[in-house]
Amino acid sequence: FFLQDRDGEHHSPGQLYDRVSEIFVLPGLKGSSQRESMFSLFLSCLNDIPDPLLCDVARIVTRYFASRGNEVLTHLQITPNRQFLYLKAFFILKHDIQGRNPQTLRRVWITRLCEECPSLLVPQLDAYGYEYFDLEHVCSEASTHHVYDALFWALDRRGLTTLAMDQLDKLAMDLAQHTHQVLDDGVDDRADSEAESSREGVCKRFKKLHLALTMAFRLCVENSLSSSASVEFVHELWFRVLYTLVRLEHAFYDSSRIHAPKDSLLALALSHSQTFTQEALATLVTSVPSETISFAELFKRLVHGISQANIMY
């Protein structure tokens, strides 16, 4: 009754844990062997425990059934959202700095974060540091679920920052190509539900790109201020980001649609790409010492690169 919240108390978070703790101090249940005998009953009740009380379940497992944690995790895997709610209690920001959570738990947590709450992934990575989680697993899951800011973070911590820039360029160019395909389908000339869905899809992809760019800017700044990064490497990172953005912006200067209305998808795409470029330049100018990177050399290289590029969509 207590576990299934059927005794009329309608537990709020914390109360279920308190009531179970009261049971386990009763005569005959104080010993670990006696409590262990109740584990199968506890496990059989998990599916009926309300979602808001799953953090209490995590506390109960940690205190009374610590050796059976994997069984609980396995039992909950058929309901990924509930498994995510259960795991939240183990990964309060900066709570497990000593590394008590086993790697199995950490790996499942990364997967569930990518699926259920991708915006929390980078804060988790920042809080625990690059040695806490399996970064190869982070890269795999973040790539699968298109959580690009976390993917770039993990690649950088693995010493693969240039690969992150490759991913950024591909993401931007794929977006440009997709946007042109939608435009060629006449989305700006129609007002039906399919056209609206296509517009929304493009807007979502721009939002994903913005998140990825924000992380790319951050990585550029961090490497610019790092004593271990060479000037040549820092220059290359900034060039890669700016070159990608200039190419993206140029992709939407379409002379055949030069007079497109301001609310058209083309105008929106161009506005977004211009804003991204402005953000990159503002970050570069305000965050990187002028002696660290030659702006004149960087912009000269950009102009040359763009003049040599053959951009096809």
Task: Identify what each model region corresponds to.
Residues 1-139, 148-156, 161-313:
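Extended non-globular scaffold/tether segments
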